[in-house]
A protein has these predicted regions:
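Short, strongly hydrophobic alpha-helical membrane anchors
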Residues: 1-17
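Membrane-interface helix caps and helix-loop-helix hairpins in membrane proteins
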Residues: 56-63, 122-130, 149-153, 172-177
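Membrane-helix interface "capping/anchor" motifs
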Residues: 31-42, 147-159
Length: 216
């Protein structure tokens, strides 16, 4: 038992602390976003700044660029949510969730797939990037999914579940163990986020229907 504890302690001592800080802040962002808290965006801003450097250092260039984009979207997301959230409350009850139809998402996915293939080809042939196609696919779809979060679109969580599952393989291959663990947790939190937002969406839909009946 003592040997196991010593081995575990030694393992955590060797972990890259910059990655651990980024991991914890990213986890805070996802949990806060799932709960509808405006404070998710400051956590996102700091974590993405750290991950921009971390991914560049291991030649996951598209992931590095993606986190640079996240950095900007953290500012935009905070601004968008603050317009539609009571700053005194800042909780999930203040969220106004929307849902976009399946046809719209199918068209978006087809366009994003074409874009990802084109960018993947460029990354494979003109950069030293590892896993250029998978890295590009997760990046392109994550860009889109992040925009959906800022617009409070219910289906964003379904995109994140798929993106996070693909990312788990990518980070295992690059030996980014803390980040791999983080993305396993992300899959769970994204599932929770979808069900949480679905309830809020259904609740707001009932309110709108009731309002329409009482105010013809």
């Amino acid at each position: 038992m003592l040997a196991i504890l010593n081995s575990t302690f030694a393992y955590f001592q060797q972990l890259p602390w910059l990655e651990l800080v980024a991991m914890l802040l990213s986890l805070a962002y996802v949990i806060l976003a799932a709960r509808g808290s405006l404070w998710c965006w400051p956590a996102a801003f700091i974590s993405t700044a750290l991950y921009t450097y971390i991914f560049y250092d291991v030649l996951l260039l598209m992931d590095s660029a993606l986190n640079g984009y996240y950095l900007l979207m953290a500012i935009y997301g905070y601004w968008q949510w603050s317009k539609r959230t009571d700053n005194k409350q800042q909780n999930s009850d203040d969220l106004t969730i929307v849902s976009w139809n399946v046809t719209w998402h199918v068209k978006a996915c087809l366009i994003l797939t074409v874009v990802a293939f084109c960018l993947g080809y460029l990354m494979a042939n003109f950069t030293p990037a590892d896993f250029p196609y998978l890295d590009t696919f997760t990046t392109v779809f994550a860009v889109f999914a992040t925009y959906l979060v800022t617009q409070k679109v219910l289906e964003n969580w379904l995109y994140w579940i798929v993106i996070d599952l693909a990312s788990i393989y990518l980070y295992i291959e690059k030996d980014l163990i803390p980040t791999t663990v983080l993305f396993v947790v992300f899959v769970v939190v994204a599932s929770y986020g979808y069900h949480k937002w679905l309830k809020l969406y259904q609740k707001s839909s009932i309110k709108l229907q009731t309002s329409a009946l009482t105010n013809p």
